[in-house]
Amino acid sequence: MTTVIQRRSTSNVWEQFCEWVTSTDNRLYIGWFGVLMIPTLLTATTCFIIAFIGAPPVDIDGIREPVSGSLLYGNNIITGAVVPSSAAIGLHFYPIWEAASLDEWLYNGGPYQLIVLHFLIGVFCYMGREWELSYRLGMRPWIAVAYSAPVAAATAVFLIYPIGQGSFSDGMPLGISGTFNFMLVFQAEHNILMHPFHQLGVAGVFGGALFSAMHGSLVTSSLIRETSEEESQNLGYKFGQEEETYNIVAAHGYFGRLIFQYASFNNSRSLHFFLAAWPVIGIWFTALGISIMAFNLNGFNFNQSIVDSNGRVVGTWADVLNRANLGMEVMHERNAHNFPLDLAAVEVAPAVRG
């Protein structure tokens, strides 16, 4: 008779779950942040799809004039959007159970809050998951730091700006044309083009695109040939190979002669840090600028700052921007008020003299 003695498993279900969640052997890493990220992003995505297709019109301005945003109510992919919550709701937390009925919740734009708040929690957790996986693999945390730039930008337009303006109705609509409308209104009310933080963001995005194109083209132009003329040079690279796949000395020499010597990096590590840091810092500044303008600390205003010897205004580009801002503000919420605040603040003579 043979007796087989097996060691009793000491791990319970919770320990097995913890091991599975934190295991780096999974095809997709879950992580503790992923435990919260997955349901929140699924909720936001599901609600967005349903609302984009079939949500009824929303009384965004709080004046009983609903605005349609879904496909089934006359929009297409370009004009469709999830319309922000009503100005009548303001900054109040507005879950489904706070409304008297589902129809009221939809009429006041409840789906917008549901989507935005779940989405922000989800992207915060995605950033934490990036750090968590880097930690498990013994990597440095800069991937999560870089991702913090778009997270900060999304937080600025979806949360900080509505808080500063006093209502979720001022948040960015969830759609293509809604995004452009948000940009135009933001320019009209805050003169963002004349804000130095936005200008730093433009330099970061366009500069990052330029540097990325320059780096990619230099590397591609200085590959070390490992193949014949009839084969693609891409076949000369083997995943995980120890030797360099391109000649950094040749790329450095080319670029140094094209511009000047010190414009070219001779250190691959500092080069790639620069490529990551430039756009990230620029987008950080943009998010910070939007957060500042949310509380009406706006861009520079040089309106009528130059006059000639006779006191006549010498028109500048700033004056062109100011006129454009007034025009855009007149078009914005045209049924809520007849004139922008700049014009409505002018003292008007009484219509009836007593």
Curated annotation (Swiss-Prot):
Fe cation binds at residues 215, 272. PANTHER family: PHOTOSYSTEM II D2 PROTEIN, PHOTOSYSTEM II PROTEIN D1. The lineage of its organism: Bacteria, Bacillati, Cyanobacteriota, Cyanophyceae, Synechococcales. NCBIfam families: psbA. The chain crosses the membrane at residues 29-46, 118-133, 142-156, 197-218, 274-288. Tyr-161 forms a radical intermediate that is referred to as redox-active TyrZ, YZ or Y-Z. The record marks 161 as: Tyrosine radical intermediate. This is Photosystem II protein D1 3. It is an enzyme of class 1 (oxidoreductase). The record marks 190 as: Stabilizes free radical intermediate. [CaMn4O5] cluster binds at residues 170, 189, 332-333, 342, 344. It is found in: Cellular thylakoid membrane. Pheophytin a binds at residue 126. One of its GO terms (molecular function) is chlorophyll binding. Residues 345-354 form a propeptide. It comes from the Bacteria. Chlorophyll a PD1 binds at residue 198. A quinone binds at residues 215, 264-265. Cyanobacteria usually contain more than 2 copies of the psbA gene. Chlorophyll a ChlzD1 binds at residue 118. Belongs to the reaction center PufL/M/PsbA/D family. The keyword Ubl conjugation does not apply. It is a multi-pass membrane protein. It catalyses: 2 a plastoquinone + 4 hnu + 2 H2O = 2 a plastoquinol + O2.
